[in-house]
Curated annotation (Swiss-Prot):
Keywords per UniProt: Toxin
Keyword Phosphoprotein: no
One GO MF term: toxin activity
Recorded superkingdom: Eukaryota
Modification after translation: Processed by the macrocyclase-peptidase enzyme POPB to yield a toxic cyclic heptapeptide. POPB first removes 10 residues from the N-terminus. Conformational trapping of the remaining peptide forces the enzyme to release this intermediate rather than proceed to macrocyclization. The enzyme rebinds the remaining peptide in a different conformation and catalyzes macrocyclization of the N-terminal 7 residues.
Position of the Cyclopeptide (Val-Pro) cross-link: V11-P17
Family: Belongs to the MSDIN fungal toxin family.
Residues excised as propeptide: 1-10, 18-32
Full protein name: MSDIN-like toxin proprotein 2
Length: 32
């Protein structure tokens, strides 16, 4: 995972805990 994503993940999860899983799934798909 790139540094940019590593920095954004905590922010998205902190702002939208319920959508955290969706964001991670989208990021993993983009990275993969």
């Amino acid at each position: 995972m790139s540094d940019i994503n590593a920095t954004r993940l905590p922010v998205w999860i902190g702002c939208s805990p319920c959508v955290g899983d969706d964001c991670i799934a989208l990021l993993t798909r983009g990275e993969g």
